[in-house]
């Protein structure tokens, strides 16, 4: 299991959510087996997304898709308000 962790500012959460939802089929086809959307309690204009994949290689490929096809297009990422920070994480321990 690997998690693609993404965080970035947004201009409007509703607009961001609608854009995120439009790519549900792409996430499924790319191997995403679960996701979490979080927001800081003190910042309605920031979003954190965790996308779970069976392998780190799948997470890396999907990150490449986001970097080249989504985040570079105002039509595909209409609420993106700053450069996304990303990491691919693997679990070490679980409680």
Model regions: which residues?
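Short hydrophobic/aromatic beta-strand micro-patches
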Residues: 7-9, 50-52
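Short, surface-exposed ligand-recognition loops at beta-strand->loop->(often short) alpha-helix junctions
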Residues: 9-19
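Residues that cap or initiate secondary-structure elements
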Residues: 12-14, 55-57, 92
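An amphipathic, aromatic/His-enriched active-site/gating alpha helix that lines ligand/cofactor pockets
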Residues: 17-36, 52-86
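Residues that line or immediately flank small-molecule/substrate-binding pockets and catalytic motifs
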Residues: 39
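Short, low-order "capping/linker" segments at domain edges
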Residues: 87-95
């Amino acid at each position: 299991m690997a998690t693609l962790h993404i965080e970035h500012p947004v201009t409007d959460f509703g607009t961001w959510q609608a854009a995120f939802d439009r790519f549900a089929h792409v996430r499924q086809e790319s191997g995403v087996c679960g996701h979490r959307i979080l927001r800081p309690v003190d910042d309605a204009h920031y979003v954190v997304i965790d996308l779970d994949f069976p392998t780190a290689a799948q997470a890396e490929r999907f990150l490449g898709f986001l970097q080249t096809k989504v985040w570079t297009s105002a039509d595909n990422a209409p609420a993106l308000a700053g450069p996304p920070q990303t990491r691919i994480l693997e679990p070490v321990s679980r409680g």
